[in-house]
UniProtKB/Swiss-Prot annotation:
It is found in: Cytoplasm. It comes from Clostridium botulinum (strain Loch Maree / Type A3). InterPro entries: Aldolase_TIM, Methyltransferase_A, RlmN_N, RNA_MTrfase_RlmN, rRNA_lsu_MTrfase_RlmN/Cfr, rSAM. GO terms for biological process: rRNA base methylation; tRNA methylation. This is Probable dual-specificity RNA methyltransferase RlmN. One of its GO terms (cellular component) is cytoplasm. The gene is rlmN. [4Fe-4S] cluster binds at residues 111, 115, 118. Keywords: 4Fe-4S, Cytoplasm, Disulfide bond, Iron, Iron-sulfur, Metal-binding, Methyltransferase, rRNA processing, S-adenosyl-L-methionine, Transferase, tRNA processing.
Amino acid sequence: MENILDFTLEELKEWLISKEEKAFRAKQVFDWIYNKLIFDFNNMKNIPYKTKNLLSDNFYIGVPKVVKKLMSQDKNTYKFLFEYNDGNIIESVVMKYKHGNSICVSTQVGCRMGCKFCASTLDGVIRNLTSGEILSQIMAAQKEIGERISNVVLMGSGEPLDNFKNVTEFLDLVTSDTTLNIGQRHITLSTCGIVPKIKELADKNYNITLAISLHSPEDLLRKEMMPIANKYSIKELMEACDYYINKTNRRITFEYALVKGKNDSIKEAKKLSTVLKGKLCHVNLIPVNEIKENSYEKSTLKNIESFGNILKENGIETTIRREMGADINAACGQLRRSYVSK
């Protein structure tokens, strides 16, 4: 059986026609799934009994079940553990803002990139998520909170560009007016920096925001924090970023997790200013998530502000990420890891 969420409207129409069914039934089915959030063919009232049986015999609606849900005290952040049909578990986080609800979705079960500050990668990657499985996190979360989600961040477990085909198919699906109709400018894709795939993404010319996990302006330290840096130097990464900016005319966000005594000095701030000078970019400073598997500690607020001020003085737009749901916000991957290890 196939997950119907992996299908576009046109693909479902073609399939129905091949089974001597009416093509317009595809639009009705999509309306039930994406607008009414009905995930059982038998509950689709305007679909004939024969067609329901045909769909049920060939497809499943692959929305994961909620195995754990945490809500912050201020009720602005929800953390979900979702379980797919094969028993694999991933995390998603919903954040409520005045301008709308955002969701951070996972693109893989686990991750193979090995970044030292991330709990998602500690057990390696189990498998890629399909386009429909990524999409289904949004739908499951919308049903749980009873509100529309209008912004998507691909920043959960997994490296999106390590699952390039499925992730780009997801981008095509989620932005379609036949599904969730989320605008491309409301989507951010975060990568550790797979250089060839950044260029390939640029060639697709999406209007999404690309976020690069940088975390150091120096190759030696970046290699220590992020194994991907052993394959691609900062020079190569910056060249790929320039290609992306020139191709899409979109500003890149550089994410920089500040670790006390490691990458938070004035020297590093000045070096980062030099590396990014003249680029159409924005820097997002992040107090590092502390996980027990490493000794990284959050930089002090004073250091973070001083670091940011150096960047601003050099003409680089900089913000400090607002921490939401601190009372439930274990580092990305920790909730899943603690649940799976039980």
